[in-house]
Design a protein with these regions (language model features):
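Conserved active-site tyrosine of GNAT-family acetyltransferases
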Residues: 103-109
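Conserved acyl-donor/pantetheine-binding loop and adjacent beta-alpha core of acyl/acetyltransferases
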Residues: 16-63
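Conserved acetyl-CoA-binding loop-helix of GNAT-fold acetyltransferases
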Residues: 72-85
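Conserved short alpha-helix immediately C-terminal to the canonical SAM/SAH-binding motif I
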Residues: 79, 99-103
Length: 135
């Protein structure tokens, strides 16, 4: 029985996941892991965000675990930048607190409280010039 090919990093798995979900044209969610990193990610072809707007091609990330030896070295910021490139119109990050919350706000994310899901969402919206801005 042939072995399933293992993709060596969460970043490459993310690219493959988003490209595959976009090609299928339906929403998907999964958990990715490699070398101790874990990420829950979702792709939605269409998603209304309360008090912000309606978006196409949304990437949402949550429940991220970074191994201790890689923390405070910029891995998460780089991962957010990668996900922003993969998203068509919006990138959503769920439940960020402390220094991470402050960093996202400095990067232009807008904080939205989702009462239905009882969580904080941080939304970065792409403009036609492919930059992130506040709505």
């Amino acid at each position: 029985m042939p072995r399933k090919l293992q993709i060596p990093s969460v970043e490459l798995q993310t690219v493959e996941f988003v490209q595959s979900a976009r090609a299928q044209g339906v929403g998907h969610e999964t958990r990715l892991s490699a070398r101790g990193f874990h990420v829950a990610i979702e792709y939605a072809p269409y998603l209304p965000v309360p008090d912000v707007g309606e978006f196409n091609g949304v990437v949402a990330i949550s429940d991220v675990y970074v191994p201790v030896r890689y923390r405070r070295r910029g891995w998460f910021s780089g991962y957010v930048a990668l996900c922003a490139l993969l998203a068509d119109q919006a990138l959503i990050i769920a439940d960020a607190y402390g220094p991470l919350r402050e960093s996202l706000l400095r990067q232009g994310f807008v904080e939205v409280f989702s009462s239905g899901a009882a969580q904080r969402l941080f939304v970065s919206i792409k403009t036609s010039e492919n930059t992130s801005t506040k709505p």
